Swiss-Prot record:
UniProt lineage: Viruses, Duplodnaviria, Heunggongvirae, Uroviricota, Caudoviricetes
InterPro entries: Phage_T4_Gp38_tail_assem
An annotated GO cellular component: virus tail, fiber
Full protein name: Tail fiber assembly protein U'
Domain of life, per lineage: Viruses
Function: Chaperone involved in tail fiber assembly. Remains associated to the tail fiber and participates in the host receptor binding. Binds to the primary receptor. Two alternate tail fiber assembly proteins U and U' are encoded extending the host range of the virus.
Subcellular location: Virion; Host cytoplasm
Keyword check for Cell division: no
Induction (free text): Expressed in the late phase of the viral replicative cycle. Expression of late genes is activated by the viral late transcription activator C. Expressed alternatively with tail fiber assembly protein U. The switch from S-U to S'-U' is performed through inversion of a DNA segment called G by the phage invertase protein Gin.
Signal sequence, start to end: none
Family: Belongs to the tfa family.
């Protein structure tokens, strides 16, 4: 199985490559050990999956046809076309690590960022949920039931805002009904 690492753009290395670059504006890609990406494609098997992963191991492209891949700035690995590997996708939740395709593991910093993103998303939900009630309150036309809901959601927003996302794991308060 093929595994090409750290593929980057480089200058043409032969007269023919130079002519092709000049004529068709071709970008030449090379692995960290100097192999030409275009020449290496013929060494991939047709019945395998070709996965492109970034410097963190996160899978960013999956193809059966190696010629459909642009691996610039990444790595390409060939894996068997089996159920376990077909479960992977390019959502950012899968990675290639230690020779196998696995569910992604997140660093603490990534987990903190995810928690902060979730916090902002929850606060936006509160704004969306309470916008009409807030307008009704300002106009003095809110029903007692909606006033109670507005209060519950605003108390929830205070709890979300005070949630510390720098300390893992992060637990957010339950949403009002």
């Amino acid at each position: 199985m093929m595994h090409l690492k750290n593929i980057t753009a480089g200058n043409p290395k032969t007269k023919e490559q130079y002519q092709l670059t000049k004529q068709f504006n071709i970008k030449w890609l090379y692995t960290e050990d100097g192999k030409n990406w275009y020449e290496e494609q013929k060494n991939f098997q047709p019945d395998t999956l070709k996965m492109v992963y970034d410097h963190n191991g996160v899978i960013i492209c999956i193809e059966k046809d190696v010629s459909a891949i642009n691996p610039e700035g990444a790595n390409v690995v060939e894996v068997p076309d089996i159920t376990a590997n077909r479960r992977a996708d390019i959502s950012g939740k899968w990675m290639f690590k230690d020779g196998v395709v696995i569910k992604r593991t997140y660093t603490e910093e990534e987990q903190r960022q995810q928690a902060e993103n979730e916090k902002q998303s929850l606060l936006q939900l509160v704004r969306d949920k309470t916008q009409l009630w807030d307008s009704q309150l300002r106009l003095g036309i809110i029903s007692d039931e909606n006033k109670q809901k507005l209060t519950e959601w605003m108390l929830y927003a205070q709890k979300v805002e005070s949630t510390d996302t720098s300390s893992l794991p992060v637990t957010f308060p339950e949403q009002p009904e």
